[in-house]
Amino acid sequence: MDIVPISPYERMRPLRESKELRIKSFDDHRWPHKNNPVMTKNMIENYFYYIGINDKIQCVHCGGVISGFLEEDTHRISYEHRRHFPKCPVGKYRHPGYHLDAERLKSFKNWRYENIVRKMDLVAAGLFYTGIEDRCACHQCGNELYEWEAGDNPKEEHKRLFPDCKLSSY
């Protein structure tokens, strides 16, 4: 009987689905940027995990590996991801940490406007709650929508206000 090895994409499924597992990967004593928690947070939110060699990180979606980070690269993780791996679906998101519906839904924990617009409709429109008043942002384009009124359709409002967003065409 032939045994087919698990594909790299399937092998990384737990890391894709669990932010906690990605966080734990950076707890390794070999991670050279422990003194820069903002850099580490940006790597985790961009779906990278530490592979345990020098400062090499790997994307759990495309499998791309990036290394050689400088302190000034702290806020360039998303840019470097797109630059090196332009076909990766995660690198195309303005807020990759909210790429999954489940992550966006978690952001609505303190949502007080359910009587005006349902959080499930906002999540379905690709939006996450910023935690400020009724402001929601698109994980794809990064634009914010706010001042919701009863009867607003999040998908339609998103499309009307930001027609160039790729999510607006869905």
Swiss-Prot record:
Name of the protein this chain belongs to: Putative apoptosis inhibitor ORF87
SUPFAM superfamilies attached to this UniProt entry: Inhibitor of apoptosis (IAP) repeat
BIR repeats: from-to residues: 22-92, 104-169
UniProt keyword list: Repeat
Record organism: Ostreid herpesvirus 1 (isolate France)
PANTHER family linked to this entry: DEATH-ASSOCIATED INHIBITOR OF APOPTOSIS 2, INHIBITOR OF APOPTOSIS
Tagged with keyword Repeat: yes
InterPro entries: BIR_rpt, IAP
Single GO biological process annotation from the record: regulation of cell cycle
Entry keyword annotation includes DNA repair: no
Function: May act as an apoptosis inhibitor.
Matches recorded under SMART domains: BIR
Membrane-spanning parts: none
